[in-house]
């Protein structure tokens, strides 16, 4: 198979391949970029594999960075772009089920492609656009299959994160998991506990917000992977609702909010759950706000102060979450009500703490409490947002 019209991300890198070829070495585009080219998906960057050793690449190109030279990777800076170029290699000994203990450089592309995770990622393309396919990756692309290269169990023992990558690719590409590969995940799911939470989280989020997440999540549950991640052990019955949803979350915050709701976590358990997954403080706050506002609109209509405290981003996220869960909510009415608020943040209020101090309010906690009272009064339409009305409100109430 030959590709004649390459997108710019490839044509810009062709001179790099040509220079390596002209120096007497083989060089190919490899991996996800070739897969995405064949699927007409957006390509972020390209990876290059070569028979040249790292020191030979450094002799060919003037500007290089030793990004992973021990494992055969050199970054080449060329025409304002950076390209990761990795020597053909084989790997052996995976005591931590993630990184190889030994890397051996080889001169054969086929040997290099053997170590890759799935057949659709074991494709290569030469400088003329010819596709090299030693493991029927093209056939699996046509069949929409995620299949491990060679024996699936071996691939997962080499890198247990590949089991999460399998369900992630299922979700992103809306492919099916090949039965033997699925069985190997079921047989080896315990190995996932050897992998850092951060890496598992990244794959889980990519799976959860992609268009095929319902089917992928079902496999995530059926194979036992869900038993090896923070907070999910023994919760299969709760999580089984996810594959039945009509829509997938499209943001990371809504994915976590959805998990919290399905798991029926009380509000005081949310911080611990989010930290178990090594989420940032900012993500933790964002998710807690969405869950709190979802609980609020599920019980009663929000007033102006509720909308003010939530903010537009949380309101929109919560509307999306309600749609995912099939809960009736008048989203446009909520947004319209928010847009009609007399103030939307602290800066919109014509006075601040300094104004209160100047008007005889003693410094201390009372200043903050009074500011909140004033905001509520403005939001509820009791007073106008001007200094005269606020001054009168203070004199009458304090």
From Swiss-Prot:
Binding site for CTP: 32, 35, 116, 159, 162, 165, 168
UniProt xrefs under HAMAP family: CCA_bact_type3
Domain of life: Bacteria
Residue sites binding Mg(2+) per the record: 45, 47
Keywords: ATP-binding, Magnesium, Metal-binding, Nucleotide-binding, Nucleotidyltransferase, RNA repair, RNA-binding, Transferase, tRNA processing
Gene name for this UniProt entry: cca
Record's subunit section: Homodimer.
UniProt protein name: CCA-adding enzyme
Family: Belongs to the tRNA nucleotidyltransferase/poly(A) polymerase family. Bacterial CCA-adding enzyme type 3 subfamily.
Organism of derivation: Lactobacillus johnsonii (strain CNCM I-12250 / La1 / NCC 533)
Residues the entry annotates as binding ATP: 32, 35, 116, 159, 162, 165, 168
